C-alpha cells in the first residue's frame, strides 16, 4: 500500500485523484483572488501586488520577445503567462505544511504539457496552413524526408514527456526533500530548505514558460520570419 503524507484534503477523502483535484482547484482559486487583488485598484504608480505583477509581466515579455519577437510575445502571453503563474503558485503551495503541490502529480503536469503541445500545433497549422506546416517535418532534403518525418514526429511527441516529467520530477523531489528535512529537524524552522524550494519553484515555472514560447516560435515563425 502506497504511503501518503496527510494533507487538509484528507479530511474529505483519501482518494489520490480527489486530493490532486482538490489542490488544483484550490491553487486556481488562490491565484484568481491574488490576481484580482493586484488588478482591482490600478494606479499610475504601481504599488504592492500591482507592482509585483507588473514586474513579472515585464520580465516575461522581456525574455519572450528575444525568442519570438515582441508582437508574438504579447499575443501568446495570455497562455504562457497564465501557465507560468499557475505553475509557480502550484509549486509554492506545496511548501505549506498540510498542502500538496498539484505539480507533484504527473497526471496534472501531463495535462499542462498536452495543452502546450496541442496549442502550438494548432497555431502552426493556423498560421502556415496544414500542408506547409507539416512539410517542415520532412526537412530541406527531399530524399531524406522518409527518415526525417518520423524522427520529427517522435521528437515532437517526446516534448510531452520531457515537459511533464521535468516539472513533475523536480517538484516531487522538492516536496520529498522538505518532508525529510521536517522529519529530521522538526524543532527548527528550516529556512534554508524553504529558500531553496522557493527558488526552484520560480525556476521550474520559468523553464516551462520559456519552453512554451520556444515551441510556439518553432511552430509559427516561417523561414522568412527568422
UniProtKB/Swiss-Prot annotation:
GO MF assignments: proton-transporting ATP synthase activity, rotational mechanism
PANTHER family recorded: ATP SYNTHASE SUBUNIT A, CHLOROPLASTIC (PTHR42823:SF3)
Membrane topology: Multi-pass membrane protein
Protein name: ATP synthase subunit a
Taxonomic placement: Bacteria, Pseudomonadati, Campylobacterota, Epsilonproteobacteria, Campylobacterales
GO annotation, biological process: proton motive force-driven plasma membrane ATP synthesis
Alphabetized UniProt keyword annotations: ATP synthesis, Cell inner membrane, Cell membrane, CF(0), Hydrogen ion transport, Ion transport, Membrane, Transmembrane, Transmembrane helix, Transport
Its job: Key component of the proton channel; it plays a direct role in the translocation of protons across the membrane.
Pfam families registered for this protein in UniProt: ATP-synt_A
NCBIfam families recorded: ATP_synt_6_or_A, PRK05815.2-3
Transmembrane residue ranges: 18-38, 79-99, 105-125, 134-154, 179-199, 201-221
GO cellular component, one term: plasma membrane
Family: Belongs to the ATPase A chain family.
Cellular compartments annotated: Cell inner membrane
